[in-house]
Curated annotation (Swiss-Prot):
High-level lineage: Bacteria, Pseudomonadati, Pseudomonadota, Alphaproteobacteria, Hyphomicrobiales
Source species of the chain: Bartonella tribocorum (strain CIP 105476 / IBS 506)
Signal peptide: none
Protein name listed in UniProt: UPF0102 protein BT_1882
HAMAP family registered for this protein in UniProt: UPF0102
UniProt family annotation: Belongs to the UPF0102 family.
Length: 130
């Protein structure tokens, strides 16, 4: 069972955050392509949660959370345990749809988009409890 929580944030601020997030995700996708990954999904949404990017290289699947923040520490702190659980639930749904599921190795990564810097890719940012 998935819980959906809604915040009361002013519309202009939500729009600004949305477009900043979309730009950050596009930059992160470019970065992963540069590193030899194929982008399987962008903004994969389920009732349980959303995955910013799903990338593949061979049997390795990256479930990527993208955060645009001023510092790396802020980006890392922006991913709460609740976010991780939602990402895991959405990943389970995506993985269940893959024909080669049994062959896949899954990793949960973070890509931090920082001002005037290259994207910072943190492999295995968190691990699944499942």
């Amino acid at each position: 069972m998935c819980k959906i929580m809604h915040k009361t944030i002013p519309k202009k601020q939500r729009q600004k955050s949305f477009y900043r997030g979309v730009r950050a995700e596009k930059l992160a996708a470019w970065w992963l392509r540069f590193k030899g990954f194929h982008i399987a999904e962008m903004r994969f949404k389920t009732k349980c949660g959303e995955i910013d990017l799903i990338a593949r290289r061979g049997n390795l699947v990256l479930i990527v959370e993208v955060k645009a923040r001023s510092t790396l520490l802020e980006a890392m702190e922006a991913v709460s345990r609740m976010n991780e659980k939602r990402i895991e639930a959405a990943a389970d749904i995506w993985l269940a749809r893959q024909k080669d599921y049994a062959l896949l190795s899954v990793r949960f990564d973070l890509i931090a988009i920082l001002p005037w810097r290259w994207p910072k890719h943190i492999p295995a940012f968190f691990t699944s409890d499942r």
